[in-house]
């Protein structure tokens, strides 16, 4: 064979070998992209980003072989190039954050742009150009904060009580709306009758843990623009009653209860200081999670938990002090009311309720939690069973213990037992809001 043929064969062999080697070292996912330090992103499942042009948005490029070069290109939807630049990276970093360039031309508010990033690594793939990758992200500019219109609200709110607000959040890119009381946020539910608009309804508690009440309706959009409007109610305070309970006077009553097998004083303090708090934490957690569903309150009726008229005793937030030789051993606020029935001890349940808990608690004994929607739940304790009043748990008073929770916060039960209060503070504001909405 001639020399020329041998050279040609050698070239073909070298070229073929390199092509095989190049195919082996070229990898489709040698480089990856992520947004603002999040999980890896790809072009097939990438959601639109909304940008207020304030908080920086960064695309992170990751390459185990080191990043060789990257290019950033910004275009409008009609293919007008706003920015284009390529950068060579000599120090071979394995990761690099590329900040998105803010558009410098006017009139882009409410417009969407395409950001494209091309990158290569320092590998020998692609004829020594390195592995390459491409990422495209749609970014919509939104610098306008949502506006809030309060349609109606309860005329007042009492310390430890409840109120309602119906409002509209105006923003086509709205992401969430809620009510903030102090530093705690309470969910607002969409009013389903007006799905085409961002109409929300929220039951608002004045927590007994806060001596004053300051609330705002808050709306945020997808670009993280936010707005807050003060929620103004006439505020009502209540005088808190106190009740002294002498431990020695309880002995005859509590000795009959099976939980008192050992020292009465020690067991009582243990139940009050630990078991009760543990039960309350569990009750609040269940009510907060399980009461989180929408329900129409337009025809909400006062709670009637017993089969016959009852007498309300031992008020909400009554301060109970347990004494021994005139010394206070323990004290707490009563987070409910006690209802004293007549001869009929049967429980009555509204058909609209959702039973979310039925079981035995250490302090409260056999208990039920039923929820009505919008975060409102009722807690019934010291029951005989799920159908009647009893004396299970540590029961210090006769009758039915009833507590109300609003998004996990204990509130005044007497309000929800009062038909007139419900008409004035709940139903009337709902009707007023609907009339305004029907007018357009």
Feature locations, PLM:
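Short beta-strand segments of immunoglobulin-like
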Residues: 37-50, 152-158
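Zn2+-dependent peptidoglycan hydrolase active-site motif and core
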Residues: 348-386
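Conserved, short, structured surface segments that act as functional micro-motifs
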Residues: 312, 368-371, 388-433
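Proline/serine/threonine-rich low-complexity linkers at boundaries of modular beta-sandwich domains
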Residues: 16-42, 129-147
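Short, solvent-exposed loop/turn segments at the edges of extracellular beta-sandwich modules
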Residues: 120-128, 220-224
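Surface-exposed, short loops/turns at beta-strand junctions within beta-sandwich domains
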Residues: 102-112, 205-212
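Non-catalytic extracellular/periplasmic "stalk"
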Residues: 154, 161-164, 169, 174-318
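Short, glycine/small-residue-enriched coil/turn segments at secondary-structure junctions
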Residues: 296-308, 326-360
């Amino acid at each position: 064979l001639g020399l020329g043929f041998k050279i040609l064969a050698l070239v073909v062999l070298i070229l073929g070998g390199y092509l095989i080697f190049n195919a082996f070292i070229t990898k489709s996912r040698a480089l990856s992209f992520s947004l603002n330090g999040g999980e890896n992103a790809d072009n097939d499942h990438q959601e639109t980003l909304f940008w207020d042009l304030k908080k920086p948005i960064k695309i992170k490029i990751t390459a185990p072989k080191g990043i060789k070069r990257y290019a950033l290109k910004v275009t409008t939807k009609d293919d007008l190039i706003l920015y284009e630049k390529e950068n060579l990276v000599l120090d071979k970093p394995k990761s690099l954050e590329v900040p998105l360039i803010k558009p410098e031309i006017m009139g882009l508010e409410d417009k969407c742009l395409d950001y494209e990033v091309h990158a290569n690594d320092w590998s020998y793939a692609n004829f020594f150009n390195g592995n390459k990758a491409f990422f495209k992200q749609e970014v919509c500019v939104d610098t306008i904060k949502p506006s809030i219109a309060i349609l109606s609200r309860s005329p007042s709110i009492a310390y430890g009580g409840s109120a309602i607000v119906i409002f509209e959040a105006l923003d086509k890119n709205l992401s969430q709306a809620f009510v903030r009381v102090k530093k705690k946020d309470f969910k607002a539910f969409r009013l389903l009758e007006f799905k085409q608009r961002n109409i929300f309804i929220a039951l608002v508690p004045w927590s007994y843990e806060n001596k004053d009440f300051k609330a705002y309706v808050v709306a945020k959009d997808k670009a993280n623009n936010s707005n807050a409007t003060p929620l103004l109610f006439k505020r009502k305070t209540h005088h808190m009653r106190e009740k002294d309970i002498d431990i020695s006077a309880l002995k005859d009553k509590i000795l009959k209860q099976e939980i008192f097998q050992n020292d009465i004083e020690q067991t009582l303090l243990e139940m009050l200081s630990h078991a009760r708090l543990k039960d309350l934490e569990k009750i609040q957690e269940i009510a907060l999670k399980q009461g989180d569903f929408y329900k129409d309150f337009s025809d909400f009726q006062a709670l009637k938990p017993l089969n016959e008229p009852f007498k309300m005793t031992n008020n909400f937030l009554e301060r109970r002090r347990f004494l021994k030789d005139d010394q206070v051993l323990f004290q707490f606020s009563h987070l409910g009311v006690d209802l004293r029935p007549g001869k009929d001890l049967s429980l009555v349940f509204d058909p609209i309720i959702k039973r979310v808990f039925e079981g035995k608690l250490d302090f409260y004994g056999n208990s039920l939690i039923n929820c009505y929607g919008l975060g409102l739940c009722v807690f019934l304790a010291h029951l005989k069973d799920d159908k009647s009043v009893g004396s299970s748990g540590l029961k210090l008073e006769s009758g039915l213990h009833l507590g109300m929770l609003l998004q996990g916060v204990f509130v005044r039960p007497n309000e929800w037992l009062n038909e007139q209060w419900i008409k004035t503070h709940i139903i009337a504001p709902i009707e007023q809001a609907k009339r305004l909405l029907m007018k357009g």
